Amino acid sequence: MTDTATARIPSIPRRAFLGGSATAAALGAFAATGLARQGTAHARPGDGEAGTSASSTVPMTVGRGMADMTGEPLGAGMNGYAVLEQQTSGLRQRQFARAFVFDDGNGGRVAHVTADMGLMFQSIQLEVIRRLQARFGDTYHEGNVLIGASHTHVAPGGTSGHLMVDLTTLGFRPVTFEATVTGIVLAIERADADLAPSQIALTRGTVADAGINRSRGAFDRNPDADKAVFPDGVDRDSVTLHVIRDGAAIGLINWYGIHPTTFGPEHTIISGDNKGYAAWLAEHKAGVDHTNPAEAPYVAAFAMSAPGDVSPNHGLVPNSGPGEGNEYESARILGRRQLDGITGRAIALGGGGIDARHQWVNMREVKIEGRWTPDGQPGTTGPAILGAAFAASSQEDGGGEPMLGFNEGSRGGTPWVRQVNQVAVPASASAIHGAKENLLPVGYIPGLVQQTHVFHLHRIGGIVIASLAFEPTVVAGLRMRRAIAEALDVPMDVVIVQGYVSGYGHYITTPEEYEQQDYEGGATIFGRLTLPAATQIFDGLAAAMRSGVPVDAGAPEGDLTGKIPPSPMGNPLVDVAPLGKNFGDVLSAPEGPVAAGTAVAVAFAGANPNSDLRHETGFLSVEKQDGTRVADDSHEATVIEWNKEAAQTTATITWDSSGAAPGEYVIRYRGSARGIGGGLTPFEGSSTVTVA
């Protein structure tokens, strides 16, 4: 199925969608296309789109909200690279949950959340739903709550209900789990309270020079028709759902496929990476105070699409992004480029209300019809096995352990694993996993990895979102979009595939890419035919949606939530100030005036930050003498790091004073000290710095 022609909107400056009076230009631009008439906003669930008028905006009741969900910034294992030594030591950017609730007035409702974290897990999804139902009854449930991870690799982990992931963070982290769940629930509650008549619009823009295909040899195994869609191996399309209310843009959800692996595994300071920076910058330009997200006038969620084989490291080695060796600058550049992609051609929407189908599927044993397989023969998936190429990690982005000698297929693979497979792997497993050098049979040990996954299909005012727990490659995402568009009889332009939602199932490559056995193929855990299985599942959901019939939703499989031992690392005991000092006292600071542009560092007698994560208040601020705040611990100009020796903790705040006007500035540090009895005592310290 091919994309249909869509109306174009005039080129709009980026700030046109970023709040303030300029946002009126956005609605005017849509109106200028002649397509801004009212669509059919309240179709019954199951209604098709036949007979509705295509519009560039569709009426919909929408609410948006955001909340702080920052996890433990000291001593917590980070989630993404599986490097045990990568434990949090500071905070460059707070983590946020950004939620949108869509309601069609006819019983159709969807909550869509983007969370600044490495991976999403069933444990988080189900706990969020339990808490929402305690407040809202059955308004929110497994079928209408989508929680996606941004996939940053520099945020605390230890929040999975499956053992393998939590092993990489040396155990479960209850404090970070609670921070994550509480933040997501609060964001949805705020979005629910914000529900009001709005309009939604969809644009497709282009993101230039953000990402490179890190497994080009595998990509090139695909048929020419697939490769022709992505000449450089990357999907440059940026898809944005804009929310407009009373003539002003009040939020957006953007989908673009790129890995947030700008920061390598040696980096231990919490950051949202390129997607987190794009979201912060959009909101900052719109006047959002990130210490008070409850009052945010604009919410910008930069979600994932299908980035499985797309790296931000343009030199195809770690730390080779556009910042020329500066990881943070690379994240900023790539974030700005994604923000630049939020405008583009308006996509005509067929209108309609909200419709949804979801299904829990045991991925160990999906029977696949021949029409979905490369050779036309029926096939099956199998219990999860991770290959040697997975253990090698993506050698373009980092992770893995070189001393173990594992390699991706493009680098020769791992011959000794192949030899072991010949005698140790059952023929049935070998048939399913094919070219994979089978290393870790994680699916044969209960509780190690999630194997029953939920697949969601939602239609919101003509926009179709297919979400799943996997990391699809670029072409895998394309094939799923094609199948869904054909089954629903809608243009491909309105179909979005989003990974990292409601769980984690590792990768999905095409069967052709799988044969290469690069990292992505080694991490396609259910076998060579995982993509045909997922495509068949989505085809079934789409067919049911088009016909207006329900599906058997199935049920999640139990996990080990509450049974995985907590991590012993970074847990606060008692805090002790240095001899002769009080908590908050300045230990070191610049002597005399500093030139604008200087990185100003002030060290304080601190406390373990894990005792009090200071959500929506913050650990630091930089203020003018009149109290006007110029930066906080979400701002791009600041970073706070903690160094703990025995019971003493030093907190060092670094402020980039670039652009600061001459004058005096106060750098404030806030924390809470834990006493012998476990009680917390808040404290504050400050240092005045003169910028010459």
Segments (PLM) and residue ranges:
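Non-catalytic substrate/cofactor recognition surfaces at enzyme active-site rims
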Residues: 51-692
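N-terminal export leaders
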Residues: 13-19, 480
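N-terminal secretory signal peptides
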Residues: 1-12, 23-29
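Short alpha-helical segments used as structural interaction elements across diverse proteins
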Residues: 11-12, 34, 95, 478
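C-terminal region of N-terminal signal peptides and the immediate post-cleavage residues
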Residues: 30-53
